[in-house]
Amino acid sequence: MAKQAHITMQGGGKVVIDLFDQDAPNTVANFEKLANSGFYNGLTFHRVIPGFVAQGGCPNGSGTGGPGYQINCEINPNKHERGTLAMAHAGRNTGGSQFYICYAPQPHLDGVHTVFGKVVKGMEFVDEFKGRDVMESVQIVEV
């Protein structure tokens, strides 16, 4: 069965993301573990740059925090296109909880960051982000 992430935004709106658990199994497992534990609930998309990315998943709300551990990159053939979900990091193998969704193709990030999903519904809500947009909940479902 395939997995999806459902990000419900405070104030309405749901972003549905197909997860690439065959291409990035450890990254998807980490994201699922954090989501299932409620880690992302109440966190924000702290970095929103139109035409580039919307980044979230920092418990400090500033881009400086994480879950207290790091995970290895799982570079794969998937490209950074509009709607791509990928892990943010401060250097190879330093990802943890922060992720981003691309607003437009970002080929300079291909082969550098782990792509682990793609928005399939609700990209219009991501397009409306202004910064500090709150994730009410993140749930992983099997479809």
Could you say what each language-model-derived stretch is?
Residues M1-V143:
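Cyclophilin-like peptidyl-prolyl cis-trans isomerases
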